[in-house]
Every structure is written in structure tokens, then in C-alpha cells.
Amino acid sequence: MRRDKMAWIGILSLVGLLAPVSNVAKADDFSTDNNLISKSSEIEPADPQSAFLVSKVKILERFENKTNLTDVELKTLLSLVGFKGRDLVVAWAVAKKESSGRPLAYNGNQKTGDSSYGVFQINMMGELGPDRREKFDLDSNVELFNPVTNSKITFHMTKGGKDWSAWSSVNGPRYQEWYNKYPCKS
């Protein structure tokens, strides 16, 4: 009995080793008898960069129109749209200071000159609104409640996280508190 099992294991191992070689050899003999395939299929080697981009897009899709974000989700989203290193920490702290990381945050206080939307409280007051809608191809200010859209626009407005001059909250005491609370510091 034991001897039969060993023989079967040997046969299956041999088949397992030869099957891939056999399939590669048959790939050139691809037939079109069923009329479903018009010519030989060639499999291109996967580009690691494109595989990463596909997975990045898939992960970003999970954040589309999300109505709340955990601290770690916010960090992940900001990293996916392009913030890196210290700029990522700054972006996270600004988002927490501006909206507590809430995608649906809105400040419509006209006395302070605000009509600000989303995670980064992008201000659309007065002439800023039409200008920014055109520049960022927005049909409506409401699109800024989408955390992916809001974060991508902020990444662009801050020149990749290098220029936060449009945000008065940077370097204030509340910002510094959030900066010090950044999750996942390495």
C-alpha cells in the first residue's frame, strides 16, 4: 500500500513538472477551429509598474465618495494621491485640522470668507469657485465632498505638498497637535 502511494506521488510530481513545458510547446499550435479566436494569442510579460498602477487605481476606488475616513484610511488615501514623506505627514495634519478628516465637512461662514468643502476645506467663495471649477474640471462644488477628488486637487494646489500657503492652518498650534498625532510614524 505504502509502495503504491509513493508510486502515485512520483507520477503526479512528474506530470506536474512536465505540464507547463507541454503547454508552452502547444501554445504555437493554437487552432482557430472554433472561430472564437482569429489568431495566435501572445502573452506579454507583466510590467511591474503597470501592475502597481492597476492595484493603486483599485485601492483608490474604495475611497471614492466615502463619507468618513479613519486616521489610517486618510493616511493611505493621501499616500495614494501622491503625498510622500514629511509632505504626507503635513497633508494628514492639515486635513485633520481643517475638517477632522471628514469628507463631508462644509464651512459656509461668509464672515470669515468661507465656502469651503471636504477633507481639505477647499474654499470656493466668490471668484475662487468659477476659477477652480474650470481649472479642476468640476461641474459642481459638491464634487469636493469626494475625498479622492479633494485630495488630488489639494496635491495639485500644494505643488505635491511643498507649498501650503493657501492654507492658513499650517504651523498653528492645532495643526502641530495633529502633526504630532500622525499614525504609523516610522
How should these model regions be labeled?
Residues 85, 103, 162-166:
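Secondary-structure boundary/capping signal
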Residues 90, 109-111, 117-186:
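Catalytic and binding regions of secreted/periplasmic enzymes and modules that target cell-wall glycans
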Residues 95-115:
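Short amphipathic alpha-helical segments at helix boundaries and their inter-helical linkers
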Residues 21-23:
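N-terminal membrane-targeting segments
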Residues 14, 18, 29-101:
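Export/targeting segments at the very N-terminus of extracytoplasmic proteins
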Residues 59-65, 76-82, 106-109, 136-147:
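Second-shell loop/turn segments in exported
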Residues 1-11:
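N-terminal Sec-pathway targeting helices
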Residues 25-27:
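Boundary at the C-terminal end of the N-terminal hydrophobic targeting segment
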